[in-house]
Amino acid sequence: MADRLTQLQDAVNSLADQFCNAIGVLQQCGPPASFSNIQTAINKDQPANPTEEYAQLFAALIARTAKDIDVLIDSLPSEESTAALQAASLYKLEEENHEAATCLEDVVYRGDMLLEKIQSALADIAQSQLKTRSVTHSHSLPDS
């Protein structure tokens, strides 16, 4: 996973791409402008362009990307954050990490204990089945 600055740069690049695409679609689909002193030939056979749908699509994309950029900017450390605050935050994160590691070790230990019990039970079942088979096999043999 990329760091926050890389994510922010990617989001800004995505926003720039969306603006370029929106402008390109507007140029392609927009009706020609009329100039009073210049006569232009307008192709009357052009099909109706779904410019409203494009406008809504690009507006939604641009708005969502702008919100993503705001969230990424808000997640960056502020200038007000001093070294002492950062150290305290790191210390707290380390404590939480140690607590999680202890909890994980406990869960692994309990899992190992359960595994031993299950393996012991499976061994007992296998022994019982072997004994049962040997007893039934010896009873089924005809006497000579």
Swiss-Prot record:
State the tissue distribution.
Answer: Expressed in brain, heart, kidney, liver, lung, skeletal muscles, spleen and testis.
Out of the domains of life, which is the source?
A: Eukaryota
| Alphabetically ordered keywords of this record | Activator, Nucleus, Transcription, Transcription regulation
Compartments in which it is found: Nucleus
The record, for Pfam families, names: Med21 (PF11221)
Entry-linked PANTHER family: MEDIATOR OF RNA POLYMERASE II TRANSCRIPTION SUBUNIT 21 (PTHR13381:SF0), RNA POLYMERASE II HOLOENZYME COMPONENT SRB7 (PTHR13381)
**Family as reported in the entry's similarity comment:** Belongs to the Mediator complex subunit 21 family.
**UniProt name for this protein:** Mediator of RNA polymerase II transcription subunit 21
Q: Which organism is it from?
A: Mus musculus (Mouse)
